[in-house]
Amino acid sequence: MTVQEQIDEYIVGQPEPKRSEMQELHRVILEIMPGCKLWFLDGKDGEGKTVSNPSIGYGLRTINYADGTTREFYQIGLSGNKTGISVYILGIEDKKYLAETYGKDLGKASVTRYCVRFKTLKDINIDILEAAIRNGRKGKSEPGAIATGFLSR
């Protein structure tokens, strides 16, 4: 099964309205990051034990560890969870930046150092989420321009 087929199967397996909202977010992220590398992580470790929610990844970044080793991983992630949807924005160095820059304007969402978690798209300001994703794509802790929204409410 290709990565795109795994992604499609994962999204289709979500209950509504999460399914439609994840399809829309998937489309939007691909518009923001055309031609990016796609990932699908099934949430299982090497022994097949579930250790996290499955996630869709977009883009490519290299993680540098203190011991000198490196690992390739995605820049932006999308995952369904028990209470809604999580968007992961990785690579921003300042751990407070995402919450301080976008948290108060996002709406009804929980924002941590790299994750925006919300119940439904109706609860958040879509333009602000898009700006955070665009900024995360750059991998920098600097304000990104808020572009016109790709998402419809």
Q: Language-model features: where?
A:
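Charge-dense, helix-prone N-terminal extensions
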Residues: M1-R153
